[in-house]
Amino acid sequence: MIRVGLGFDSHEFREGIPLRIGGLTIPHTHGLSGHSDGDVLLHAITDALLGAVAAGDIGAFFPPSDPKWKGANSVVFIEEAMRHIETAGYRVGNVDCSLVLNAPKIGPHAKAIQESVAKLLKIEPTAVGIKAKTPEGLNLDGTALAHVVVLLEKR
């Protein structure tokens, strides 16, 4: 049996904070604001994983109203979501991710992001799709979005 999860997240760029995407720090003049580290990709993956096993969403597990999660590394969110899918008897088959942002260019970092996500999800890098698009005509210059679909397989 398989299950599919869909994840989405968005964060605004701000000066003075590091840019975290896929569990990595990416060199850039601005980072993504958020209650945690603002890792838009890991947040969308977390939502997709939790949704695939009908466990809720990232806000139910890590509410922004809880000071415990202020500045938290989003890797913790992925680890918790992975515990839920494993407890439900599933493993990740593959994940496909689209990042929507004007800058920085993701191409030079795509392989490192792919490897980081693969390690977190306990899959091969070839099972992780990382794509980047620009938000042409959408007036989203100061924002990054992530769209994710994940396929889970029964273990």
Curated annotation (Swiss-Prot):
Q: Per the record, what are the reactions this protein catalyses? A: 4-CDP-2-C-methyl-D-erythritol 2-phosphate = 2-C-methyl-D-erythritol 2,4-cyclic diphosphate + CMP
Under SUPFAM superfamilies, the record lists:
IpsF-like (SSF69765)
Known EC number(s)? 4.6.1.12
- Tell me the cofactor note: Binds 1 divalent metal cation per subunit.
EC class (word): lyase
Q: In which pathway does it act?
A: Isoprenoid biosynthesis; isopentenyl diphosphate biosynthesis via DXP pathway; isopentenyl diphosphate from 1-deoxy-D-xylulose 5-phosphate: step 4/6
Pfam families given in the database record: YgbB
Cofactor requirements of the protein: a divalent metal cation
Which annotated residues bind a divalent metal cation?
9, 11, 43
Which InterPro entries does the annotation name? MECDP_synthase, MECDP_synthase_CS, MECDP_synthase_sf
Question: GO terms for molecular function, please?
Answer: 2-C-methyl-D-erythritol 2,4-cyclodiphosphate synthase activity; metal ion binding
Entry keyword Zinc: no
Q: Indicate which residues the UniProt annotation says bind 4-CDP-2-C-methyl-D-erythritol 2-phosphate.
A: 9-11, 35-36, 57-59
Q: Where is this site: Transition state stabilizer?
A: 35, 134
Biological process (GO) annotations held by this record are: isopentenyl diphosphate biosynthetic process, methylerythritol 4-phosphate pathway; terpenoid biosynthetic process
Keywords from UniProt, A to Z, are:
Isoprene biosynthesis, Lyase, Metal-binding
Assembly, per entry:
Homotrimer.
PANTHER family recorded: 2-C-METHYL-D-ERYTHRITOL 2,4-CYCLODIPHOSPHATE SYNTHASE, CHLOROPLASTIC (PTHR43181:SF1)
Q: Which family does it belong to?
A: Belongs to the IspF family.
Q: What does this protein do?
A: Involved in the biosynthesis of isopentenyl diphosphate (IPP) and dimethylallyl diphosphate (DMAPP), two major building blocks of isoprenoid compounds. Catalyzes the conversion of 4-diphosphocytidyl-2-C-methyl-D-erythritol 2-phosphate (CDP-ME2P) to 2-C-methyl-D-erythritol 2,4-cyclodiphosphate (ME-CPP) with a corresponding release of cytidine 5-monophosphate (CMP).
Q: What is this protein called?
A: 2-C-methyl-D-erythritol 2,4-cyclodiphosphate synthase
Could you tell me which species this protein originates from? Answer: Koribacter versatilis (strain Ellin345)
